[in-house]
Amino acid sequence: MFVECLPQYSSALDLISYAKWVAPGEGEGEILDFQIWPKRYNEYRNSGKPYVDFLYDHPALHGVDRQILLDCVPDGPPPGLPERYNLLAPHGISQGFHYPLAELMNKAEEQMGTYFLMHAPCHCYYSVPHWSASSVVEMAQAIKHADKFMTINSAPAVLASALRQNRLTYFLPQKEQWAQDNVAPWPGRVDVEL
């Protein structure tokens, strides 16, 4: 199986062995278009269905197991993190509902004690220990290996749904009209409120 996407998104395929990347327009054979933005965005919003339900309504996916399988994530902590740690993933790029960072940090300390704040690579300063992944694989590895994990509804939450089955994960969902975007619940996920 090949997945057609822009090069900047192709590193997500490093997490799996069963699909390979191909540049847009270079795919061959039957092509299934699951892209929602921008062409199907209004259809998605108007459906009222959760994101995953809307995606899996595609006829080619009927009866498919919805559990994400990430079979190429290394064991152990990634470079820069200790053997034991808790992790907060407070950032995302597609959230309609935004949580104040200071409140997320307070909630993380309340629920997990000491933690590392995961952020995008930058020359930035945080008042708590912080870490950034140099790749999508390192981000997934950090999420998988954390003792406790807290995340907003963003890419780290999707990774956690695959990598942290039955492991304590605090989840801060999208609210109000954006609740439709939330990742489907998984065993080990605990929804928290600020």
Region locations from a protein language model:
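Catalytic machinery of carbohydrate-active enzymes
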Residues: 1-194
